[in-house]
From Swiss-Prot:
Class in the EC hierarchy, top level: lyase
Primary gene name: PYRG
Keyword Phosphoprotein carried by entry: no
Sequence similarity: Belongs to the OMP decarboxylase family.
Full protein name: Orotidine 5'-phosphate decarboxylase
Listed EC numbers: 4.1.1.23
GO biological process: 'de novo' pyrimidine nucleobase biosynthetic process; 'de novo' UMP biosynthetic process
């Protein structure tokens, strides 16, 4: 798989043929931030307060909306309003993994109304390519009111110890993304996936975005198997956007932590594109 990670976000925005990918790169460039904060909070009040406080420093807010105990229309309204106020995208970390017909209903409808407010969602290839086809059908349909404003990330790898998201699974994730590139804009992975060869050849316009989870300046991991890497290490390994949760929101000063991750992530990104231009 090819990578355009040595190009600037501005260059990639100009070249990308997917409108939501272009918007993401434009946000990153404008805010000088490649930070995705994983807001794993359990009430609407906590979630919206964090989004409002950290919004100026992030490119994307990642949610696990099914852990919000009092999810309601005010949750949706608040997320959408703050996304516009602070110019960030919303990524619902739903990890869709079911038959296509069910996934379509979970995404576009149901109690969580995900397609209404989440710019990005993700899915696992575990259920087969049909799940990706189903989501792509919904997201690219002319009847879909948010066409061009939504995108899908494939869960190609995970940061947990002992994960089975490796090898053939990762390759299948890439193959599916290539088949449905009108809706799939990138991957959740621990590194650039350029070493993995697929049956589908790369196109000139191919530019999948890499989101890396488990980014934490305290690299010890946790007792439940999560493994961490620093912002600089993640960018060096090919991340375009770095996802951090507890490393930011669980600190004594989340705003200061968000600024720190923003600065470190951006500095690592600038080093990467500078090295491209100087030939190092």
């Amino acid at each position: 798989m090819t990578s355009k990670s040595t190009l600037s976000y501005a260059e990639r925005a100009r070249q990308h043929d997917n409108p939501i990918a272009r918007k993401l790169f434009e946000i990153a460039e404008a805010k000088k931030s490649n930070v995705v904060v994983s807001a794993d909070l359990t009430t609407t009040k906590e979630l919206l307060e964090l989004a409002d406080h950290l919004g100026p420093y992030i490119a994307v807010l990642k949610t696990h909306i099914d852990i919000v105990s009092d999810f309601n229309k005010e949750t949706v309204f608040g997320l959408k309003s703050l996304s516009e106020k602070h110019n960030f995208l919303i990524f619902e970390d739903r990890k869709f993994v079911d038959i296509g017909n069910t996934v379509q209903k979970q995404y576009h409808g149901g109690a969580l109304r995900i397609s209404e407010w989440a710019h990005l969602v993700n899915a696992s290839i575990l259920a087969g390519d049909g799940i990706v086809e189903a989501l792509a059908q919904t997201g690219t349909s002319d009847a879909f009111e948010h066409k061009g404003e939504r995108g899908l990330l494939m869960l190609a790898e995970m940061t947990t110890r002992g994960t089975f998201a490796t090898g053939a699974y990762t390759k299948a994730s890439i193959e599916s993304a290539k088949k449905h590139s009108s809706f799939v804009i990138g991957f959740i992975s621990n590194q650039a996936l350029t070493s993995i060869e697929t049956q589908i050849p790369a196109t000139h316009m191919e530019d999948f975005i890499v989101f890396t989870t488990g980014v934490n300046r305290a690299t010890k991991g946790d007792p439940l198997g999560q493994q961490y890497q620093t912002p600089e290490a993640a960018i060096k390994r090919g991340a375009d956007f770095i996802i951090s949760g507890r490393g930011i929101y669980a600190t004594s000063d989340p705003i200061q932590a968000a600024k720190l991750y923003q600065n470190e992530g951006w500095a690592a990104y600038e080093t990467r594109i500078k090295n491209r231009s100087t030939g190092y």
